[in-house]
A protein has these predicted regions:
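Juxta-kinase regulatory segment immediately upstream of eukaryotic protein kinase catalytic domains
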Residues: 2-3, 7-30
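ATP-binding glycine-rich phosphate-binding loop
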Residues: 23-46
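Active-site acidic catalytic loop and adjacent metal/ATP-binding pocket
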Residues: 42-46, 85, 200-251
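ATP-binding pocket architecture of kinase catalytic cores
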Residues: 50-146
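ATP-dependent phospho-/nucleotidyl transfer catalytic cores
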Residues: 55, 113, 142-220, 325
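A glycine-centered beta->alpha junction motif in the catalytic cores
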Residues: 102-115, 166-173, 300-318
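ATP/Mg2+ or Mg2+-diphosphate-binding catalytic cores
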Residues: 165, 304-352
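Active-site activation/catalytic loop segments of kinase-like enzymes and analogous catalytic loops
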Residues: 252-285, 298-321
């Protein structure tokens, strides 16, 4: 999040469209732009009212109002370390410029969380628990679109498990197979078996009753809790940003997703998993039935499925080498990953 390059001044070197956009942002947010610079998918904006983060939103106002309401709910419940939106002159959390939506929030000075640093990982785990606690009781604003994945994961796991086999068929039908196809075909059985195991464990767990509890408690999850959305501020406080994917969800999804993001960077070291769970539990202890759902999430081969899905359905325009490197990275983790799964299973008394 630190600004390393020279910041371009507002008044020079701009196209007409950029100048009109900035004029509208100034007008709608009642600010004066002094400097503006692209930075990792957003804009660093220096204004007469302080440093800001300007972001173009790629979804509609109904979803944006859900995200805005979620952040305001957290702040109201004492969880203030989020990138809250400034309101425009009409009291709305966005500017509308040529059918594009822009949000404006404070620029948080700090660094991205280092997932190889176990102390920073513990801080992030504790902050996630605080977020989940503060999320309780969220009623979305009027005219917002309620987003929810509650109850969907048994269906999603089964569907994605079957998709692994379907994509093998797609690879086999190719007359000219590329290296990715060959690697995928060779390894898919292992990941297909993991998907079957994970789906069975989830179906035999208390997943649905946990979803009912989450629905009754009106909780939500961040749904993209990863290093670049966890900022260690210059004040050593932990800030959470980018709630674009937040939705109604059981907390074990966020925990499992966070754990996977960390563990793949530390060779699936069980100590990091224990550190995350222990730190989370100091704020809001997990119950026995939640460990079973957590285990199912950790077991499901989400990364392998997602990569293959992107490849066979052309979801991203990466080159062949990028796809090959990514699938090889996943496969090369297989031994350490399975060792971790057995250790987790033993440590937290899981079966299946």
């Amino acid at each position: 999040m630190l600004i390393k390059q020279e910041v371009v001044t507002y008044k020079y070197g701009r196209g007409w469209i950029d100048m009109m956009r900035e004029f509208e942002i100034e007008r709608q947010f009642d600010i004066k732009i002094e400097k503006l610079k692209p930075n990792k998918g957003v804009y660093y904006l220096k204004s007469n009212k302080g440093d800001r983060c300007l972001k173009r939103i790629n979804y509609g106002t109904q979803k944006l109002l859900f995200v805005y309401g979620a952040k305001e709910h957290l702040a109201k419940n004492g969880f203030e370390n989020v990138d809250r939106y400034f309101l425009n002159i009409e009291g709305e959390p966005y500017a509308l410029v040529n059918e594009d939506l822009y949000t404006l929030s404070n620029w948080i000075k700090g660094r991205e969380c280092d997932f190889t640093n176990i102390e920073e990982v513990k801080l992030a785990a504790k902050k996630l628990a605080e977020l989940h606690e503060a999320s309780k009781g969220y009623d979305p604003p009027e005219n917002s679109k309620l987003k929810s994945d509650l109850g969907r994961w048994p269906y999603l796991m089964e569907k994605r498990g079957k998709a692994l086999e379907k994509m093998r068929g797609m690879a086999r039908k190719k007359n000219l197979k590329k290296d990715f196809d060959i690697i995928y075909i060779k390894n898919v059985d292992f990941y297909k078996e993991l998907a079957i195991r994970a789906t069975k464990i989830l179906n035999n767990s208390k997943y649905l009753s946990l979803c009912e509890e989450a629905e009754a408690e009106k909780v939500f999850c961040h749904h993209d809790y990863t290093y670049h959305n966890i900022i260690i501020g210059d004040d050593n406080e932990v800030y959470i940003i980018d709630f674009d994917y937040c939705k109604r969800e059981i907390r074990t999804y966020d925990i499992a997703n966070f754990m996977k993001k960390v563990l793949k960077r530390v060779d699936w070291n069980i100590e990091y998993a224990e550190a995350i769970i222990d730190a989370y539990n100091t704020v809001s202890p997990l119950r026995e039935e939640e460990y079973e759902v957590l285990y199912a999430y950790l077991l499901f081969p989400q990364r392998y499925w997602r990569l293959a899905n992107r490849y066979y359905y052309n979801e991203v325009m990466w080159g062949q080498n990028i796809f090959i490197n990514k699938i090889n990275n996943i496969i090369n983790e297989k031994e350490s990953y399975m060792k971790f799964i057995e250790e987790f299973k033993s440590k937290y008394n899981q079966v299946g």
